[in-house]
Amino acid sequence: MSNTENKQKRVSVGKDIATRRRVARARRHFRIRKTLRGTPEAPRLVVHRSSRHMHVQIIDDLAGHTLAAASSIEPEVRAVEGDKKAKGAKVGQLIAERAKAAGIEQVVFDRAGYKYHGRVAALADAAREGGLKF
């Protein structure tokens, strides 16, 4: 077998696209988490995005506690008309309100390896407009 045939075999044999994307996101998240730490003064705002819903939590990593949370599964968000970006923005507004109620103004944004685009960006912008400082 020649070297080019061997290269072609390696390219054709492999994981499907969804698995590669999931692994790449996990690697990005690992690289991000090496530097991000949530403290009591500036807890970590972490986003999880599925194909249908978004979940966001404000976490104090030192204590290991979730201080506030919001999700697109909640009835307030389900009632929002529009696309998933609009629902992501509503989740951002909710988390900003709940953070203020808990006395949190400053957060560290953890996009969890997701690209800062679309729903993730809409959530972050809405949280900023709601008064959270990143």
UniProtKB/Swiss-Prot annotation:
Protein name as catalogued: Large ribosomal subunit protein uL18
Q: Provide the function of this protein.
A: This is one of the proteins that bind and probably mediate the attachment of the 5S RNA into the large ribosomal subunit, where it forms part of the central protuberance.
Biological process annotations from GO: translation
Instruction: Give the family from UniProt.
Output: Belongs to the universal ribosomal protein uL18 family.
Question: A single GO molecular function, which one?
Answer: 5S rRNA binding
Task: Give the quaternary structure.
Answer: Part of the 50S ribosomal subunit; part of the 5S rRNA/L5/L18/L25 subcomplex. Contacts the 5S and 23S rRNAs.
Pfam families of this UniProt entry? Ribosomal_L18p
For this UniProt record, give its keywords in alphabetical order, as a comma-separated list.
Answer: Ribonucleoprotein, Ribosomal protein, RNA-binding, rRNA-binding
Q: Which CDD domains match?
A: Ribosomal_L18_L5e
Look up and give the organism this protein is from: Corynebacterium efficiens (strain DSM 44549 / YS-314 / AJ 12310 / JCM 11189 / NBRC 100395)
A Gene Ontology cellular component where this protein is annotated is: cytosolic large ribosomal subunit
Q: Which gene encodes it?
A: rplR
- Top-rank taxon of the source lineage equals Bacteria
